[in-house]
């Protein structure tokens, strides 16, 4: 069984970019691998699209040989180089790999899969299963103070905001930092929780842009944050993940996990609250059909991302202007 403290610290600032580029460096000269093979080496096939993204932003192609990554059928595919696929073919042939009409001949002979890896995404799945077991649907008291969190991005930089509402008092905070984890469906907590933790101030309820138990392993960002910070939490998402729906109740594996309040607002409990309680709580915060603290947090993070962080602080008055 994974220890909660050890795993939390291991994954909190996990640099998946560096780990991934280390895998690419393992591909020997004279061999190729596929996007799917690299995703498997990371620990989950769902990471294949993220693999493509990380390859596309590789800033050191001479040291990190991304040209040795091809499509599943041996098609050479694209290459982020001024000369495009032509340069990729040239480099592959220089490695001794036969390429004819954009395809690698005898593909299986040149395919490399023997990565030395501890499959970090698989370990993260196990940790999420641990988090899910810690979720409680009861235990919350009165929500006097609400802290809403949102993260926006500009290239490989994140701008994370927190808005705390305590009655008529509003406080707003924004931080910025580099991103060390790409977007991979089901793993948002490992990308964004570290920002939430840095921003966190004691509050009765955490309102988070993301899912709670509406998650393949019942441990979305809101549940992850609620469990680790030991606070009641609710996730509010704009898009519905794979699930089934009966009227407005959302189910996963026959378990109620959320409520579709409207088309682009899906609410799920994160911690210390149940499905109906989370929906009722969010409805009480509606302003223009969206929970106001989270709307403001989104506006703050977005404005910082759009200006490259040149907006450095907000007064209560400017926060009201955004509202």
From Swiss-Prot:
Its main location: cytoplasm. Its EC number is 2.1.1.-, 3.1.21.7. In the N-terminal section; belongs to the MGMT family. In the C-terminal section; belongs to the endonuclease V family. InterPro entries: Endonuclease-V, MethylDNA_cys_MeTrfase_DNA-bd, MethylDNA_cys_MeTrfase_DNAb, WH-like_DNA-bd_sf. The record marks 183 as: Interaction with target DNA. The active site is at 66. It is found in: Cytoplasm. Residues 1-91 are annotated as: Probable methylated-DNA--protein-cysteine methyltransferase. Mg(2+) binds at residues 150, 209. DNA repair enzyme involved in the repair of deaminated bases. Selectively cleaves double-stranded DNA at the second phosphodiester bond 3' to a deoxyinosine leaving behind the intact lesion on the nicked DNA. GO terms for biological process: DNA repair; methylation. GO terms for molecular function: deoxyribonuclease V activity; metal ion binding; methyltransferase activity; RNA endonuclease activity, producing 5'-phosphomonoesters; single-stranded RNA binding. Its cofactor is Mg(2+). GO terms for cellular component: cytoplasm. Residues 92-323 are annotated as: Endonuclease V. This is Bifunctional methyltransferase/endonuclease. Keywords: Cytoplasm, DNA damage, DNA repair, Endonuclease, Hydrolase, Magnesium, Metal-binding, Methyltransferase, Multifunctional enzyme, Nuclease, Transferase. It catalyses: Endonucleolytic cleavage at apurinic or apyrimidinic sites to products with a 5'-phosphate.
